[in-house]
């Protein structure tokens, strides 16, 4: 294809090149506009050969591409092919002649189309041959496909996208091959280009190319239509030699040089304009690469080197500009792809519908292949390969789900469908329990497959771990063991470590390995003669290879630092039904890395595991590998496993020493939580040196429970507090509405608040326990929460008219009535309203109320008080108790008094307050049952005045009611404003609301807790004008104080504790009656 250097008027005769001597044959030339230079259109010369081989006919210049029918007229066949003339210092462009297909073709030669034409490889053309004649305009040059054209593809390893310039070492800003493609790009694979290039080189005398300064600012025929159809990105390309191979033309000097960027309409760096790409320039899809390559990559890059959205989202051209002739190459589906290349997207071919992957049977090197647009007709003939190689990629694993699986049902399974290894199972069920009697050591160095065994896992106390099954010893069963995870997520088989069977003379336990879901499981027999126990001296830990780790799906998000494991043991116990009971237990975390065991901190124990959301508590953490710069981080994770709250505990450095760290628990980020919140904390010595996370619980300080109409009290969960208030719903067939828990004419307040102030200094909750003898059972439900608010109690004087109203949230009706002996109203028996739980009390340094014993008798039975203040609590001081008993009409109730036990300095001389109303016709008598001592608050202070007993009898006609004494004790400072040392005058009312309901069947099945709200102290309601709903316990206390002011009985605490119960003829009762 090259010619010798000729003079200005010498012709380029190719007869010498091909050894032909035929006479020139008339050729037809394609007409073109006069303003267009032929050099712009004739950059590649295609030789069509047909016998007889006489002479070289002409050189054809295919504008744009061979299949585009852009010429509608042919030139006169009276011109022969003229050689290129060498013009120095001129910009005239030589003309090329177009041969017509009408004449015989004496010789055909395959054309070699490589890439855009280099300005250094062009020959000068003769510009003086301009006699063009139009002949046969309706005949087009491309009536039939040119079977002689070779389209040689690039091979996948031709160049790197980031290093190589254009494929033929072009300095152009664009090449036919997109820069978005990498060396693994799926490209056109054809026949071996080496043999073709060698064959072509043997036919031609390759000479030194000369640079043509010729150029034209204008375009070739069809340029504007080309721009309109295919966009400007394909119209401009620098000149490049058609004789250069992609393999041979890249030199050391230019293969790393970056190509200058140019816009779609920029001119080339050649001084004389830009030569058109012509037949080597073809169209795939009309999309542009990030570097404006006219020919983007035919397939997506497995490495995801696409850098611009326009390369992926450019419109796909149809085949309207293509000839209907078939393509002279074939497509194939299979290409070579690196087997371990990672694919960074699921289906990039799906977003590249216009990219065709064209290949041949033999894989060869690259040559610019013809771009093709896909239409419906061509798509079936040349199938579109979307992602046929997707299966050969190693897909990136999807993120591991952090959601915990639901167990579903009881751990009883069929033998044919045993639970998977990641299924959560309990440690005990029924009478069977699986337990680890001896835990393994916290460190065991795992071994690789390529090294020798490091022995079995050992125990911290020496020997090996011991596992025992309790509750079953009928026949031997297999104990399954595998290596599980030890992170914050639910237990599952570990991805990096497997159990390894240890054998040898020193191994006493038989075992065998099985594979369950690609996890090694060691089966160890549990024998009845060994008491269903086994020493695990046959199990080691095997570390998988890193490649195996990477291949395991779902574990790449953890990383290779997950070196802690647990030994998981599982048994399947046969059941009489033919099924099996599956139990599972996991050991403590075991560190498998030697380096991690030496560097990572380890928390062995900590002093407290819960505190209020306000924080501030001191916690002592004990462990190993603690450093002076160690930090303790509290965090809370969401359902996805990602932390959404972190806080650092304040370490008290002066108290830390060695393996002990003392810190202050940080407050929780949401102090308004209404239930306990579980968080985690860990100790870290650096960015990646963290200990295992430990659990910690924040408890709420304020929980206000309003009225809930459809909530049963028995379904309300208890709070995680040291003491819980316990009450019982009375058995009733019909529920009482909450909004009418008190009937206005039949309600009464059971007075508990004395006329003297009391300070409360503990933070425990009260206990309330009731027993329903008719139901014959005892229930403990719903604790009373504690309010984090101070309250002040002002004692009422006998003649004072000051009232403090403590409002309750659950009553819409009247809450109390004045208990005046002179009142003419008749009051029904007072029954305790169990649905009204204790009001929220003060948690800021408050003392818990002691249990409120209550006995409700629905049948003739002897009742006794059930609630006792626990004496084994950490904070012994409690508030006082109230013993109360009532009965319904026609029943006999025996109530026992509650004597308050003085547990500090002697404070007050108390007298029992006895009260036992009954219905008309009912006979009640006090029973001298054994009194239950309840500890009271030993608050230091001067003795408070004695509380005299006040027997009260319901003024109903024909009734004989005897009092049931209730003793109260208050030890505190007697002052108008009750104060305590270190409390600053904070106090709470020790009043409990009791409700009188005539019919036990009218009790509601569920109730709501009572929230006590602080009342302004300057409010003094007028007793004569307020309604029943505004009467509070203080009003009743004033009435009690007036009654008690008339009683002058004085007894000591010892007398109260040892004195017999007052009977119907007791002097106390008589004095009370006389006072009434």
Swiss-Prot record:
Positions of region (Calcineurin-binding): 110-115
Signal peptide: none
Modified residues (Phosphoserine): 345, 373, 1066
Post-translational modification: Phosphorylated by NFATC-kinase; dephosphorylated by calcineurin.
Modified residues (N-acetylthreonine): 2
Tissue specificity statement from the Swiss-Prot or TrEMBL entry: Expressed in cardiomyocytes (at protein level).
Bias-annotated ranges (Polar residues): 237-254, 362-371, 724-734, 888-911, 970-981
DNA-binding region: 445-452
InterPro entries on file: Ig-like_fold, Ig_E-set, IPT_dom, NFAT, p53-like_TF_DNA-bd_sf, RHD_dimer, RHD_DNA_bind_dom, RHD_DNA_bind_dom_sf
Subcellular location(s) of the protein: Cytoplasm; Nucleus
Disordered: annotated segments: 206-307, 359-390, 700-744, 863-987, 1049-1076
Low complexity bias: start-end ranges: 257-271, 713-722, 917-939, 946-965
UniProt-listed Gene3D superfamilies: Immunoglobulins, Rel homology domain (RHD), DNA-binding domain
BP term (GO), one: positive regulation of artery morphogenesis
Quaternary data: NFATC proteins bind to DNA as monomers. Member of the multicomponent NFATC transcription complex that consists of at least two components, a pre-existing cytoplasmic component NFATC2 and an inducible nuclear component NFATC1. Other members such as NFATC4, or members of the activating protein-1 family, MAF, GATA4 and Cbp/p300 can also bind the complex. Component of a promoter-binding complex composed of STAT3, NFATC3 and NFATC4; complex formation is enhanced by calcineurin. Interacts with TRIM17; this interaction prevents NFATC3 nuclear localization.
Protein name, entry field: Nuclear factor of activated T-cells, cytoplasmic 3
């Amino acid at each position: 294809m090259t010619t010798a250097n000729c003079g200005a008027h010498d012709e380029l005769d190719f007869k010498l090149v091909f050894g032909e001597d035929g006479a020139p044959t008339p050729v037809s030339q394609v007409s073109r506009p006069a303003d267009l230079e032929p050099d712009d259109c004739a950059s590649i010369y295609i030789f069509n050969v047909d016998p007889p081989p006489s002479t070289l006919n002409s050189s054809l210049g295919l504008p744009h591409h061979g299949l585009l029918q852009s010429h509608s007229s042919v030139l006169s066949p009276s011109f022969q092919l003229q050689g290129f003339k060498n013009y120095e210092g001129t910009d005239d462009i030589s003309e090329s002649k177009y041969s017509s297909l009408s004449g015989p073709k004496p010789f055909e030669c395959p054309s070699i189309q490589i890439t855009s034409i280099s300005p250094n490889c062009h020959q000068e053309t003769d510009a003086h041959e301009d006699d063009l004649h139009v002949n046969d305009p309706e005949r087009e040059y491309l009536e039939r496909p040119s079977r002689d054209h070779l389209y040689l593809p690039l091979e996948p390893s031709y160049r790197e996208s980031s290093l190589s310039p254009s494929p033929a070492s072009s300095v152009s800003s664009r090449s036919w091959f997109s820069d978005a493609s990498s060396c693994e790009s799926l490209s056109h694979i054809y026949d071996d280009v080496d043999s073709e290039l060698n064959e072509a080189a043997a036919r031609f005398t390759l000479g030194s190319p000369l640079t043509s300064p010729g150029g034209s600012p204008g375009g070739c025929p069809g340029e504007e239509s080309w721009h309109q159809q295919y966009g400007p990105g394909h119209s401009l390309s620098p000149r490049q030699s058609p004789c250069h191979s992609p393999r041979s033309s890249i030199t050391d000097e230019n293969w790393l040089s970056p190509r200058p960027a140019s816009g779609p309409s920029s001119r080339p760096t050649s001084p004389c304009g830009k030569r058109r790409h012509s037949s080597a320039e073809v169209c795939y899809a009309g999309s542009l690469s990030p570097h404006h390559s006219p020919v983007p990559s035919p397939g997506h890059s497995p490495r995801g080197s696409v850098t611009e959205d326009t390369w992926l989202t450019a419109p796909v051209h149809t085949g309207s500009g293509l000839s209907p002739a078939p393509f002279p190459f074939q497509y194939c589906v299979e290409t070579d792809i690196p087997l371990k290349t990672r694919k960074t997207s699921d289906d990039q071919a799906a977003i590249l519908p216009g990219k065709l992957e064209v290949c041949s049977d033999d894989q060869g090197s690259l040559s610019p292949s013809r771009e093709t647009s896909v239409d419906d007709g061509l798509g079936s003939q040349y199938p579109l390969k979307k992602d046929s190689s997707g299966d050969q990629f190693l897909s990136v694993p999807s993120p591991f789900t952090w959601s915990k699986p639901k167990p579903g049902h009881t751990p009883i399974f069929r033998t044919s469908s045993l639970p998977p290894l990641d299924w959560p199972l309990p440690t005990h069920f029924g009478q069977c329990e699986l337990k680890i009697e001896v835990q393994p050591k916290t460190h065991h160095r795992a071994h690789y497959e390529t090294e020798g065994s490091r022995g079995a896992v050992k125990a911290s106390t020496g020997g090996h771990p011991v596992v025992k099954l309790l509750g079953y010893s009928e026949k031997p069963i297999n104990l399954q063991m595998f290596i599980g995870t030890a992170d914050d997520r639910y237990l599952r088989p570990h991805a990096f470590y497997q159990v390894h069977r240890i054998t040898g003379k020193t191994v006493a336990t038989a075992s065998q390995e099985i594979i369950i879901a690609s996890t090694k499981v060691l089966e160890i027999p549990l024998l009845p003669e060994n008491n269903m126990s086994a020493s695990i001296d046959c199990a080691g830990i095997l570390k998988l290879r890193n490649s195996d780790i990477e291949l395991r799906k779902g574990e790449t998000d953890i990383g290779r630092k997950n070196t802690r494991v647990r030994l998981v043991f599982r048994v399947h116990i046969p059941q009489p039904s033919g099924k099996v009971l599956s139990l599972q237990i996991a050991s403590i975390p075991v560190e498998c890395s030697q380096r991690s065991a030496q560097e990572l901190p380890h928390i062995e124990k900590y002093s407290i595991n819960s505190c209020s959301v306000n924080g501030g508590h001191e916690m002592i953490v004990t462990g190993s590998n603690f450093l002076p710069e160690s930090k303790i981080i509290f965090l809370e994770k969401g359902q996805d496993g990602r932390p959404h709250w972190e806080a650092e505990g304040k370490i008290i450095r002066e108290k830390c020493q060695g393996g002990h760290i003392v810190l202050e628990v940080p407050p929780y980020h949401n102090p308004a939580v209404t239930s306990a919140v579980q968080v985690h904390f860990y100790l870290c010595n650096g960015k990646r040196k963290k200990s295992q996370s430990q659990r910690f619980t924040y408890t709420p300080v304020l929980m206000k429970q309003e009225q809930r109409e459809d909530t049963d009290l028995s379904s309300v969960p208890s709070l995680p507090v040291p003491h819980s208030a316990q009450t019982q719903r009375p058995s009733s067939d019909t529920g009482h509405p909450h909004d009418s828990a008190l009937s206005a004419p039949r309600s009464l307040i059971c007075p508990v608040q004395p006329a003297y102030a009391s300070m409360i200094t503990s933070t425990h909750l009260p206990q309330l326990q009731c027993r329903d003898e008719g139901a014959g059972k005892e229930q403990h439900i719903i604790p009373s929460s504690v309010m984090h608010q101070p309250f002040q109690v002002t004692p009422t004087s006998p003649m004072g008219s000051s009232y403090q109203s403590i409002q309750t949230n659950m009553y819409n009706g009247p809450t109390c009535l004045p208990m005046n002996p002179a009142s003419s109203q008749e009051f029904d028996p007072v029954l305790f309203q169990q649905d009204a739980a204790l009001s929220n009390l003060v948690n800021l340094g408050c003392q818990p109320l002691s249990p409120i014993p209550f006995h409700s008798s629905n049948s003739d039975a002897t009742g006794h008080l059930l609630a006792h203040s626990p004496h084994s609590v950490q904070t012994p001081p409690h508030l006082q108790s109230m013993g109360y008993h009532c009965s319904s009409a026609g029943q006999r109730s025996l109530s026992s008094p509650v004597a308050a036990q003085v547990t500090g300095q002697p404070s007050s001389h108390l007298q029992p307050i006895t009260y036992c109303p009954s219905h008309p016709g009912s006979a009640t008598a006090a029973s001298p049952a054994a009194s239950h001592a309840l500890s009271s608050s030993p608050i230091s202070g001067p003795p408070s005045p004695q509380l005299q007993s006040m027997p009260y009898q319901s003024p109903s006609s024909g009734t004989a009611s005897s009092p049931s004494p209730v003793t109260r004790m208050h030890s505190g400072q007697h002052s108008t404003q009750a104060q305590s040392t270190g409390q600053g005058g904070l106090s709470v009312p020790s009043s409990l609301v009791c409700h009188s309901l005539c019919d036990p069947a009218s009790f509601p099945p569920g109730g709501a807790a009572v929230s006590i709200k602080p009342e302004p102290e300057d409010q003094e309601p007028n007793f004569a004008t307020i309604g029943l709903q505004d009467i509070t316990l203080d009003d009743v206390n004033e009435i009690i104080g007036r009654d008690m002011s008339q009683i002058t009985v004085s007894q000591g605490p010892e007398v109260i504790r040892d004195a017999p119960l007052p009977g119907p003829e007791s002097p106390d009762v008589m004095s009370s009656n006389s006072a009434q």
